[in-house]
C-alpha cells in the first residue's frame, strides 16, 4: 500500500509541475487557449482526481 501511495504522490507532483509550466505557456501563445482548452481541462481533472486519491490513500497509510 505504501508504494501505491508514493506513486500517487509522485504522479501528483509531476502533474502539478506540468500544469504550472504548461498553462501559462498555453495562455500566452496566440490562439493557444481555444486550441488547447481540452488538454488544460483534462490536466486539471487529472490533478483533482490525484488530490482525492492521495487523500484517500493517506488514510490507509498513516
From Swiss-Prot:
Its main location: plastid. It comes from Zygnema circumcarinatum (Green alga). It holds the Pfam family Ycf9. May control the interaction of photosystem II (PSII) cores with the light-harvesting antenna, regulates electron flow through the 2 photosystem reaction centers. PSII is a light-driven water plastoquinone oxidoreductase, using light energy to abstract electrons from H(2)O, generating a proton gradient subsequently used for ATP formation. This is Photosystem II reaction center protein Z. HAMAP family: PSII_PsbZ. The lineage of its organism: Eukaryota, Viridiplantae, Streptophyta, Zygnematophyceae, Zygnematophycidae. PSII is composed of 1 copy each of membrane proteins PsbA, PsbB, PsbC, PsbD, PsbE, PsbF, PsbH, PsbI, PsbJ, PsbK, PsbL, PsbM, PsbT, PsbY, PsbZ, Psb30/Ycf12, at least 3 peripheral proteins of the oxygen-evolving complex and a large number of cofactors. It forms dimeric complexes. Belongs to the PsbZ family. InterPro entries: PSII_PsbZ (IPR002644), PSII_PsbZ_sf (IPR036512). GO terms for biological process: photosynthesis; photosystem II stabilization. The chain crosses the membrane at residues 8-28, 41-61. It is a multi-pass membrane protein. It is found in: Plastid, Chloroplast thylakoid membrane. The keyword Ligase does not apply. The keyword Chloroplast applies. One of its GO terms (cellular component) is chloroplast thylakoid membrane. Keywords: Chloroplast, Membrane, Photosynthesis, Photosystem II, Plastid, Reaction center, Thylakoid, Transmembrane, Transmembrane helix.
Amino acid at each position: 500500500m505504501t508504494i501505491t501511495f508514493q506513486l500517487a504522490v509522485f504522479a501528483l507532483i509531476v502533474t502539478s509541475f506540468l500544469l504550472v509550466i504548461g498553462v501559462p505557456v498555453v495562455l500566452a501563445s496566440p490562439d493557444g487557449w481555444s486550441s488547447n482548452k481540452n488538454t488544460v481541462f483534462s490536466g486539471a481533472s487529472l490533478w483533482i482526481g490525484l488530490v482525492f486519491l492521495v487523500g484517500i490513500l493517506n488514510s490507509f497509510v498513516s
